[in-house]
Amino acid sequence: MGTVHHMTRRGKYARRLDPALWVYIDRVNEWYPPEIAELPIAEQRAVYDAMCRAFHPGHPPGLSASDGLVAAAARDIPVRGYRLAGKAPQAIVVYYHGGGFVLGGLDSHDDICAEICAATGFEVLSADYRLAPEHLHPAAFDDALAVFEWVAATSALPIVLCGESAGGNLAAAVAHATRRHPRRAAGQVLIYPGLGGDEAGRSYIEHAEAPLLTLGDIDFYRRIRSAPGQSPDDPTFSPLRDSDFSGLPPTFVITAECDPLSSDGEAYRDRIVAAGGSAWWQEEPRLVHSFLRARKNVPRAGEAFLDILSAIASVTMLGAGDGDLISPLVGEMAGRPEGGAKDREPSGS
């Protein structure tokens, strides 16, 4: 990383990833180089937030966003709600942002939430959960659960749990904790989540040094949010370590091929299906962790984001028993054996 522009060491990924994606990767590493981990947390967050602003394309037309607070036992939790003018929402998405449990907030993923709302017509509520290291587990989970419970108590709409990376972990943990709730989630959509999977898994080995997320990064983020004596088998910390995968809502997991966490999505799909549930896993070829921010400039990331939007729009319909209600993507996924998504093969070297 010694050059002025922090050019990423490309190694085996040099030809595996599209040139447009490399432009994105290098841009992220210019903003947020690995050595930034040596700075105080407040400075890391300031740089991360500035990077997120630089990638923000603005809100789609016809969208309104408003901030509020959800009263919880520990504190009032900031939230931001999104609605599309002239559209009666058919569901509400509770969104948990990424950032390794250390970074991010309502602004960092504002554009993604806005675009989910605009594309689906659903209400979206983004949760500003507490961050590590100031607040160790289960603080983030407690906030995530409190926001779900508030939505369940105040909205009659079907609830979709959604999150990316660390937020995908929280969404899944909430789904497990609330599966017997009278207003349990109608579906969950997890975007390259870290679920506490077996690090002997395929992607952990093959992509241990992938661009933008390495095995070392995963270990750092796990340790920084762990309270003393934290059990890795706690399902509110590592949903894949749960002993019971029954009763979970219809689930879509979308992962990136070149991401050590991808095997978590595959394993999670398999556990839910084995327990009699409905789950689909889709590994997006030639993409890396955090590809959502590349959706405007990298065609492959844009295609993957459309898959995500289709999954969010469709997941609440899976219990309706009407195939006409299911989007083409969901129909294609649901037609695969073992209730799984088509596991795409890379279409390039």
Residue locations for each model-derived region?
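Catalytic nucleophile-loop/oxyanion-hole region of alpha/beta-hydrolase
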Residues: G105-L106, I112, L125-P158, R295-A301
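Alpha/beta hydrolase fold serine-hydrolase catalytic domain that processes acyl esters and thioesters
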Residues: A172-A320
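A glycine/proline-hinged amphipathic helix-loop "lid/cap" segment
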Residues: M1-L84
